[in-house]
């Protein structure tokens, strides 16, 4: 018997059959229509990798099952006591047959979605908020969450056309921060921007327009205020109606004929400038 079979309070169950129904919540993670993290299907939240699983355990999303190799179980042994969920231990080959691809990170956790707060709730007490419109790429979305966590952004607000922050790829790219940084979805867009303004936020809209204020100028002017950084989709950027509702249009000075940066990179620069000023 391995000492990993008797971690206090952890229900370790060995699984050798990839068709075992206990593993159904991890099945076909790459399929278009059967993947368990589709909001229209099971709507599960899937954490992938030791660090992301650890962040799920620290979040409001409570896993109901974990699947991983013996090696990853060993790495998580100090995190799992008290977790009321079985750990299905399997070989890497069995895991690959279940999920549909070879999983280098060696461990998954599945949790059910929980009710989401409203915009007013997540911005209450916040100094810096990221507001996203049309950010429909999961990797960009995940990167923005990681940047937000690392650079002191208090919350994220989703406008229209954004990808699902709880999609497995978004959670993975965010390194689990999509599970920890508070977020809310606007129910009336872009009218909900007025809610932010009524709560004292200065709305800074990122745009490549040469007529906009520079990022350094805009952030310095708003140093003592609550700030909402508005970023739009790759390519089209923020919609005209959203730009009209902003307080200041903000650009990042560019060179060599480059008109703009990737949305996650642009957001990171804005977050950094805000943090650099100690706001």
List PLM regions with ranges.
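Active-site/ligand-binding-proximal alpha/beta "capping" segment
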Residues: 204-258
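Glycine- and other small-residue-rich loops at beta-strand/loop junctions that grip anionic moieties
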Residues: 15, 45, 133-134, 159-160, ...
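Structured adenosyl-cofactor binding patch, chiefly the S-adenosyl-L-methionine
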Residues: 107-109, 147-151, 165-178, 240-279
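Boundary-proximal intrinsically disordered activation/regulatory segments immediately upstream
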Residues: 1-75, 162-163
